[in-house]
Amino acid sequence: IPFVEPQAWHRIAAASDDLECYLSFYCKPEDYMAKKYDTRAHSEVLEAVQSGHIKPGRTLDLGCGHGRNALYLASLGHDVTAVDVNNEATQRIQMIADEENYNVRAGYYDINAAALPESETFDFILSTVVFMFLDPDQIPSIIKNMQERTVVGGYNLIVCAMDTEEHPCTMPFPFTFEEGELKNY
């Protein structure tokens, strides 16, 4: 089956009267949500998946925002729980997930509470571009809670602003990680 390069014009011209065609558009999973819903998965999430470390399983997106990571992972077969303090955003995620027939449960959760239900465990917990907006005093409890809710052999992925001598953070975030800080957890 021939592929036409992305963003290229194409035209099918009949060489005879009996030409029959079937045209379908192919899209990589990482591009589908971006093209259809304007929500692209974070590059670190893409890298974790494409490296083979993250396999479909029970996934928690902490601070899911508009669902860029939750929807991408659900499209790959993950069973996703997506939580955020923005109810409008989680309602939109749930609507999209239902339209796409993805296994997603989206709802309200305040990450600062560090109180994920003891009855739930996950293979993969991620939080991208969220920690720098959280209460700095709660970070140790939040990370401990994430670790307690992650199955043995599971993964946690945190993407957060850092403040190092070489690359000082110029934004006035309430929290940034210091170099090597996560080694303490």
Kindly label every feature range from the protein language model.
Residues 124-138:
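A short SAM/SAH-binding and catalytic strip from SAM-dependent methyltransferases
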Residues 8, 22, 26-56, 60, ...:
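Class I (Rossmann-like) S-adenosyl-L-methionine-dependent methyltransferase catalytic domain
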Residues 10-15:
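Short beta-strand His + acidic residue motifs that chelate non-heme Fe in jelly-roll/DSBH
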Residues 116-125:
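A short acidic, Gly/Pro-enriched loop at the edge of an enzyme's catalytic core
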Residues 2-9:
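Conserved metal-binding segment of the jelly-roll/cupin
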Residues 3, 18-20:
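Fe(II)/2-oxoglutarate
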